[in-house]
Design a protein with these regions (language model features):
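Extended hydrophobic leader/signal-anchor segments used for secretion and membrane insertion
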Residues: 1-138
Length: 138
């Protein structure tokens, strides 16, 4: 039994470090892909992005990765809870725990302006943008 542990001992540290790094990446970070030009010029189509899952309070202008109708999306927060927005020509107050989001390329973005329920709920936010990665690196 001792010889078995002597043989695997040199491999234990790299294996443990790799497992801890993978766990940390899964819990703290999120890797994403920008599929369209809806966030240009800020994020180019084809860019990879790194998001922070543990993001604290979200504010206007933050770029978030979230789920909407079963799809991951990347948009900028345009209004927070309590803010008044105009949706379909009517003033509305953003509900508690929700955000109103827009793409930076508003002429080519499917965002809160077009949804029946225009709000992103906090529980649907997966991450806050931490770092865009140059699309030429893909």
């Amino acid at each position: 039994m001792k010889s078995f542990f002597k043989r695997i001992k040199p491999f234990l540290a790299p294996i443990i470090i790799t497992l801890v790094a993978l766990l940390l990446f899964h819990v703290v970070f999120m890797l994403g892909y920008v599929p369209s030009d809806s966030m240009e010029p800020t994020l180019e189509a084809g860019s990879l992005i790194l998001g922070l899952r543990i993001h604290g309070e979200l504010e206007k202008e933050d770029i978030i990765i979230f789920r909407h109708d079963g799809t991951y999306m990347i948009k900028r927060i345009a209004a927070n809870e309590g803010d008044v927005i105009v949706h379909n020509g009517q003033p509305q107050t953003v509900p508690a725990g929700c955000f109103y989001v827009l793409g930076d390329n508003q002429s080519n973005s499917h965002d809160s302006r077009y949804w029946e329920d225009p709000y992103v709920k906090l529980e649907d936010v997966m991450a806050k943008l931490l770092l865009p990665i140059d699309p030429s690196l893909k």
